[in-house]
């Protein structure tokens, strides 16, 4: 995904405020052993780009002064109550060095899960993104979590995710193996099932 930015020379609260008033958003580009670069981006274009999942989870081609560099979006600061992006941070990508970054999880086959269809189970998504490690060339836009066979009372953990070649969970996620999704039967559904069973047991067989 291509992103266009422009060099800026002024920094500080006053300069940033003037930028925002003119429809621009200040940002920085850092990393890969190069100097930090001050940039500005068109606010409206940035606002719409930020609504796309791919903008947050993939390598971006950032063009500044006619030169393109590969970056990851690392931080976004929003105004607390206005639809306004205050600042963005981009990190340069080194093709030979592994990245530590978070990618979104896409949950599949929840609606067709037997526990959901037959037992009124509810599947909760405990986390919606997970931290991985890989070379830039192997970075996936998202990871899929198949919920087709999860049973009521059971859960899916981080280590259950099928990872693409060259992608691993970061060490602390691997060690903790957190719950990704869990299937439970609501108390109301359990009570209804017990009541129906009791009615069935209480019926007198026909002579």
From Swiss-Prot:
Belongs to the bacterial ribosomal protein bL25 family. CTC subfamily. The gene is rplY. GO terms for molecular function: 5S rRNA binding; structural constituent of ribosome. One of its GO terms (cellular component) is cytosolic large ribosomal subunit. This is one of the proteins that binds to the 5S RNA in the ribosome where it forms part of the central protuberance. It holds the Pfam family Ribosomal_TL5_C. HAMAP family: Ribosomal_bL25_CTC. This is Large ribosomal subunit protein bL25. The keyword Ribonucleoprotein applies. Gene3D superfamilies: Ribosomal protein L25, beta domain (2.170.120.20), Ribosomal Protein L25, Chain P (2.40.240.10). Part of the 50S ribosomal subunit; part of the 5S rRNA/L5/L18/L25 subcomplex. Contacts the 5S rRNA. Binds to the 5S rRNA independently of L5 and L18. It comes from the Bacteria. Keywords: Ribonucleoprotein, Ribosomal protein, RNA-binding, rRNA-binding. InterPro entries: Rbsml_bL25/Gln-tRNA_synth_N (IPR020056), Ribosomal_bL25/Gln-tRNA_synth (IPR011035), Ribosomal_bL25_b-dom (IPR020057), Ribosomal_bL25_C (IPR037121), Ribosomal_bL25_long (IPR001021), Ribosomal_L25_dom (IPR029751), Ribosomal_uL5_bac-type (IPR020930).
């Amino acid at each position: 995904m291509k992103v266009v930015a422009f060099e800026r020379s002024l920094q500080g609260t006053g300069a940033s405020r003037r930028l925002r008033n003119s429809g621009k958003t200040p940002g920085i580009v850092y990393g890969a052993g190069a100097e930090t670069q001050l940039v500005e981006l068109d606010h409206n274009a940035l606002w719409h780009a930020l609504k796309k999942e791919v903008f947050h989870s993939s390598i971006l081609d950032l063009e500044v002064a006619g030169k393109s560099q590969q970056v990851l979006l690392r931080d976004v600061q929003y105004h607390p109550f206005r639809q306004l992006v205050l600042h963005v941070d981009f990190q340069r990508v080194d093709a030979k060095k592994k990245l530590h970054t978070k990618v979104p999880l896409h949950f599949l086959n929840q609606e067709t899960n037997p526990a959901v269809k037959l037992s009124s189970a509810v599947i909760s998504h405990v986390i919606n993104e997970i931290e991985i490690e890989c070379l830039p060339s192997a970075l996936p836009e998202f990871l899929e979590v198949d919920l087709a066979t999860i049973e009521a009372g059971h859960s899916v953990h981080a280590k259950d995710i099928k990872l693409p070649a060259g992608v691993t969970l970061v060490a602390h996620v691997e060690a903790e193996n957190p719950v990704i999704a869990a299937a439970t039967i609501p108390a109301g559904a359990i009570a209804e099932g017990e009541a129906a069973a009791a009615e069935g047991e209480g019926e007198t067989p026909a002579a």
